[in-house]
Amino acid sequence: MHSNLPGYWLVYSIRVLAIECIRLAPEYLPFEEGWRMQQELHKKITESQTNKNRQASMIFCEHEPVYTAGARTRSWEMPQNEKVIRVGRGGKITWHGPGQLVGYPILSLGATPDVLRYVRQIEEGLINALQSVGINGFRIAGRSGVWVRNGVSDEKVAAIGVRVQKNVTLHGFALNCSNDLAPFEKIVPCGISDAGVTTISRILKRTITPKEILDSVFNSICSALEYINTCRGNV
């Protein structure tokens, strides 16, 4: 089975007949193109739910700079004179751009989706990936995503925003690796005003790019979701 999606891709597959695409620097992915890819994979996986073998796919990318606003974002929370795309995921406004690893797992949660459990699994995978580079990430009750401790305050290093449609997931997570934090100063990230954001590189005081941590993230996410992963394609 071949993908007709354009660009420079590394193709991963997990579980049965899964196709995953990666576009990292310098081939940044426009958010709109990534959304079309999600919709295409969502349609295929939704149709496969009635088959014996279910598909499960993940897109990895670094986006071109963009703000995305979740369903709960209010108009006054939008940054001025900036491109903002309204999306159907949960949560509020955030930023995506170069240096940030974005992952979109597209998979079936079965006939009775447990969305909270799914989010916790994604968090677990990201926490384990951070441990692989010596960072202790953790959850905060009532707040999605992955956090780290900075002195007396907590900072978010990974954001999660998902949507489940016809029992199949859309959207996903964003892990701050080596991205500039200045764009976050124009918004209240994820609607949380009493905590900051950080990056892996800032924590470790050395540059860690999305490409460098991708394998660890992929393996940890697959393990947390109880999927078997295989890899094929051009690196």
Swiss-Prot record:
Domain BPL/LPL catalytic: 52-229
Matching Gene3D superfamilies: Bira Bifunctional Protein, Domain 2 (3.30.930.10)
GO-annotated biological processes: protein modification process
Cell compartments where the protein resides: Cytoplasm
One GO cellular component, as annotated: cytoplasm
Summary of the function given for this chain in its UniProt record: Catalyzes the transfer of endogenously produced octanoic acid from octanoyl-acyl-carrier-protein onto the lipoyl domains of lipoate-dependent enzymes. Lipoyl-ACP can also act as a substrate although octanoyl-ACP is likely to be the physiological substrate.
Protein name stated in the entry: Octanoyltransferase
Organism: Tropheryma whipplei (strain Twist)
